Amino acid sequence: MIFKNNYLHWFIQRRLRKNNITAGGHSQYGQDVTVFNLLNKPSHGVFLDIGANDGVTFSNSLYFEEKGWTGICVEPHPTIFESLSKSRQCHLLNACIAATDSVVNFLSVEGPANMLSGIVQYLDKSDLNRIDKEIAAHGGHKHEIQIEALSPETLLQRFNITEIDYLSIDTEGCELSILKVFDFKKTPVKIIGVENGSRSPELFRYLSQQGFYLKKCVGCDEIYMRA
């Protein structure tokens, strides 16, 4: 069964990655415009952007805010969050998302490679090598800090969110772990955009089990809709 699912994911993403770049919007590859069109261009909605960066550069949610949507941008990196707080009008949270409310070790990368920062637990050897190479080539430094982590339940209760139209996750390696702590039955989600640079079939397998199907592949992101 695992082999069958792996092949199915490979076949679908290979087909969907053809001509997958959409112009317009703020996302790196047009993910925002793609999602907006898939949802039939609604004039209002709710987004949750986990790993929002500075809220502008390659943002997956700014386009929706400009369209009149409301939502939450979550960014754990303290320095980047300062920029986020100056650029966006939606709810903002300087924290990580985890299974329980806690404190986690976070590798904070300062400089041009700051978008590669992440929770230490989920950064593998290749991630760390990439960070070191970027720092060596372009400058900057890295250090570990402790930051707040909230469960999705706590996050959504804090901002009184009962349903999500668009969930975007770009967290440098811990996307699947975040998805696994969401209760999709308690908080319905219409569409999910999740980074899968390694093209791992694990995301496909898990979200299929949760009732989502792979609709589009846009750049490094896979876009899933509720079946």
Where do the PLM segments sit?
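Phosphate/nucleotide-binding beta-alpha loop and adjacent structural elements of enzyme active sites
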Residues: 1-227
